[in-house]
Amino acid sequence: MEDYVIIVNRIEDLQLTQDRSELELIFERAKRTIVGGQDVILVRQNRNGQEEKFQTISNEQDFEEYRKQVFRFL
């Protein structure tokens, strides 16, 4: 299994549209990655399409904190 990349811009868009089901799918995949021993990498995409990595989540506790933070705004 490979590391799972979450593009934070996409998460923010889904928060704005309150697309809970799509967010759940993303976070289910991410959790399976963590449980499988790989990392979840948070990146931000700039206007040129370049991705800038700004955080790596490697354990379930940190992942759950990030998940709560995202869903708190829905």
Residue ranges and their predicted role:
Residues 1, 17-20, 49-51, 74:
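Extended interaction regions within the primary functional domain
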Residues 1-13:
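Short aromatic-glycine-(Arg/Gly/Cys) micro-motifs in beta-strand/loop hairpins
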Residues 11-24:
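A short, exposed loop/beta-hairpin motif centered on an aromatic-Gly-Thr core
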Residues 21-41:
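A short, charged, amphipathic alpha-helix used as a generic interaction element across diverse proteins
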Residues 35-74:
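Short, mixed-charge low-complexity intrinsically disordered segments
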